[in-house]
Structure formats: structure tokens, C-alpha cells
């Protein structure tokens, strides 16, 4: 990751890019005797090779038309490709910046798990939970977001490439979040949440709010690592049970995990003054500014990220309520096991949930502190200051964050009062009220009328099947493309 981030040329970037992919492959398959882990790491490896093929084409195109792989030289020579086109065949004219931008972004689609190259990330949960927290939520999986932001001088030359990035990001943000609502594995709920939040970052890139994308990347690293490690703590306390339907009532057994996961969830849904509020709200406001002066793609993206707030709230509070509230459903499972094992002296007390040791809970507390305050203290320089001066280039006509700053950032009396004013903006923002609606609905269903969840599931059987089938993307990749390749090879 350090090589990837610190590189000053495309070649070194590519080596770092591939090295973190190798690390991901090896760590997903850490428990290699498990067939599911072996399949998951192979799936991640192959899907990312599809993205990396596009990334290589993009790098080759940069070298061909700019004559260098050094960032400084390439960005200084963008005038060589600005407004230029080429003919791949007679009568066809393709924009060079668009060609480069789309191929580079295909690499980001693989690394940062954007539709349709997202299918590997949920399966990466087969790896150890700290790995899920570190590289599949906080660092490696966001490398594609970093890369596109770093290449902003190229993307600013092509509105078509930006629109492509925006459409893919909006689709990922909304539709993968919906899948999280029907998941029962606690780690997979957080995994689909990660997919959705990566979509939000990509939307920020597509509306030229590169600083907002990196800002959300940073705040997301804290609260999503907290949620993953919190899920790991629950799994430890539940003796490696991951099905939320077999949990319930854990708040009295795991108080530290319970409180810290509440903090992570409140940051994720964008609760005012929590870290996620500042970064997510800035992305949605930037998308709104782009929708006001753009076309149907910009309008689609704005509504996708806006409605995604409600979806995020629903699956997040569903996870909390199924895990920490309600009846202690794990007792039914343990009693059933005790009945089967009565002749073997089975001890039901051995399965009693318990709080995780300090080596697990201390990182939760530290991440919870950051999830509370990091956004408030960094929103000024990262979004509206000169923190990225010289590293990110935005054309004046694309500067959606300027419109956001004009609307909500008033630092005449210092950054503290400006950050407080940004925090108080929630009163007039639909984002807060959508998140609150999701909270209220989920609270009513899972705390006061649990049978309603089953009735809704039965009434919406067809949409639920579509979501449980993940829109058929796994079938497309495994049975269609991979299976088709195998059949073709057999015939040849």
C-alpha cells in the first residue's frame, strides 16, 4: 500500500497495485483447507485480473499518447490529449481522454469492487475478520478510489469518462446496499455496506468532488473497521456463530462491543456531528450540485445516493437489533444441541455468550473515538482548505465542492464555528430525515413488531429472491463467463 500511495509513476503504481492484490488473495485463503475459502480467493484473484487488464490498457494508452509514465510529465502534457481523438477504424472517432479514463477506471472497478466487478468482495469475508477490517474495508479496497483521484488531471478532460464513473458508482451505492437488507451473516451485512460506501466515494469522483471522495475514504476507514472488528468480537463471543438469526439480547453479555458498534453505526448512517455525517453529506450535496447543472446521469446519481441513505439506515439498525436486542435466540440452538448430546454430558454453559478480551475490545474503543470526532476536526482542511493543493486538479466548471462551500461552509469566525454550522445543517437536509425514517421503521419492526418482518418478506417474495440471488451476478460470472470459457476450452 505504501508503494501504491507514494509512487510518482504509473509503473511503480502498477507494482504496488498488483502486490496488494496478491496480499488480498493470500489472506482471503488464509484458512486454505476450507473449500469456501479456496474458492473465494480464486474468485477474487480472477475478477481482479479482469479489472487489471483494463488498467494495463489505460497505462499503455497514457504512455503511447503522453510519452511518459511519470506523473509530473503526464500531467504537464495533458494538453497533448485535451480535445484530441483517434480512429480505431475508418469512420470511428474516439476521444483520447475518454479512452484512457474509462480503461483506467475499469482497473478501479475491480480493485474497489464496483458493479459488475464487485462479486469478489462479499466472498472475501472467508478470510480472518481483522483482514476484512484492514484491507477489505479501510485500505486496499479503496485503492481504486485513490487512483482515480490521483489521476484527476486526466479525468477532468473528459465529461464522458466522469459520467461513466458516476453511473457505475451510483448503481453500486444503491443496489448493493439493498442486498445488505436481506443478508443474515453479520460479516456479509458489513461487506455489502462496504460495497455501498465505495459506491458513494465513486459518485464523488464522478462529480469531480475528489476531495470529498478521499475525505469519505478516510472517515469510512475508521467506522467500517470498527464495525468489522465489532462483528468479529460478536463472532468470538458467540463461539463462531455468524448468523444473526441465532443471536439476540447480546447487549447485556457484550457491553463494550454493543456500545462501540452503536457508535460505528451512527457514523455510518450519517448522524449529525459523527465523522460519517460530514463526509457523506458533502458527497450528496456535491451530487445535488451536479444534478442541478447536468443531465440524466447526474440526476440518477443524486437520487441513488439520497435513497441509499434510507437503505443504509435500514440494514445498519437491523444488524444492531437482531444482534443485541430481542429474545436470546441462541438459547434455542444450544438447548437443541444439549438435547442431542445429553448422553455425552453436553454443557450448555460452555456456549454462554461473553465479552471479548481486552486485546479485541481496546481497538474497538480507539476506533469509536475516531469515528466520533475525526470528521469534525478534518472537514475544514480536507474539503474546503488547501490540503490537496497541487495533488488534485478540478476545472472551475466542474467544481461542485465550491457550490457546497458556498451553501454550508462559513468560516469567517474560524473553522470551529464553520464545522458546527455544517453539523447544524442537518435540520434542513433530507439526508438526516431519510436516515431517521430508516431508523424509525427498523426500530418499529424489530423491537415492537418482529412478526412484521416475516410478513413483509413473504409479501415481497420475488424482490427478496432477486436480492438473495444478488441480481444474478454470481451466475453471470460463474456459470456464464467462467463456465462458458471451460466449455469452449473443452470443445477446442
Region annotations inferred by a language model:
Residues 196-206, 277-296, 402-438:
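Long, highly hydrophobic alpha-helical transmembrane signal-anchor segments
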Residues 297-310, 352-367, 371, 424-427, ...:
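Polynucleotide-recognition surfaces of large bacterial nucleic-acid defense/processing enzymes
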Residues 141, 169, 264, 363-374, ...:
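Hydrophobic membrane-spanning alpha-helices of multi-pass integral membrane proteins
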Residues 1-16, 22-350, 376:
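Hydrophobic transmembrane alpha-helices and their helix-loop junctions in integral membrane proteins
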Residues 241-248, 345-356, 412-420, 487-488:
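Cytosolic juxtamembrane amphipathic/interface segments immediately preceding
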Residues 380-434, 444-492:
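Aromatic-capped, Gly/Pro-kinked transmembrane alpha-helices
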Residues 224-226, 310-322, 434-458:
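Hydrophobic alpha-helical membrane-embedded segments
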